[in-house]
């Protein structure tokens, strides 16, 4: 099993090697991201913060929006291993799905999950996502090849789970 994603090991969503960034560069990137979101309504980026101390613990994104088909993809990541398995991901996923299905009126949501991410697989399965595609050996991490799994959830499947 590969080393977990953290601020020191690099993002699980990118193939690029992590590079240290100054506070000024981080601020500049997020200002650009905010401007891009204003200009392009095909993605929404969210920061996940812990309520108790407002600490930044992760990020989430709805992207690849196909308005004509009602499809979108999502990403969700909790950075530090010490912040995982505390319910932050479930809370964020609940809000993301509500936003995608209720606010954006999407028909389906797709998530791309590396096979080594057992926590994410369990979380998305719990929320009713179904594995639809397995891209064999599509990822390389820690000198090993891993499958990339494509999971999907339809609006009516979500509505059945979301209603009491």
PLM region descriptions:
Residues 31-47:
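A short helix-loop-beta-strand connector motif used in the catalytic cores of GNAT acetyltransferases and
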Residues 7-32:
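Conserved GNAT-fold acetyl-CoA-binding loop/helix
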């Amino acid at each position: 099993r590969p080393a977990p994603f953290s601020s020191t090991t690099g993002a699980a969503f990118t193939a690029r090697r992590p590079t240290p960034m100054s506070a000024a560069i981080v601020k500049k990137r997020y200002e650009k991201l905010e401007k891009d979101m204003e200009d392009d309504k095909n993605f929404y980026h969210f920061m996940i913060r812990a309520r108790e101390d407002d600490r930044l613990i992760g990020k989430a994104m709805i992207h690849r929006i196909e308005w004509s088909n009602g499809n979108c993809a999502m990403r969700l990541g909790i950075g530090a291993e010490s912040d995982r398995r505390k319910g932050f991901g479930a809370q964020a996923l609940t809000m993301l799905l509500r936003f995608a299905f209720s606010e954006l009126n999407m028909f389906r949501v797709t998530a791309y999950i590396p096979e080594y991410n057992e926590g994410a697989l369990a979380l998305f399965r719990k929320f009713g996502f179904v594995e639809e595609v397995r891209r064999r050996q599509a990822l390389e991490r820690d000198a090993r090849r891993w499958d990339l799994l494509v999971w999907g959830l339809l609006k009516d499947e979500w509505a059945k789970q979301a209603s009491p």
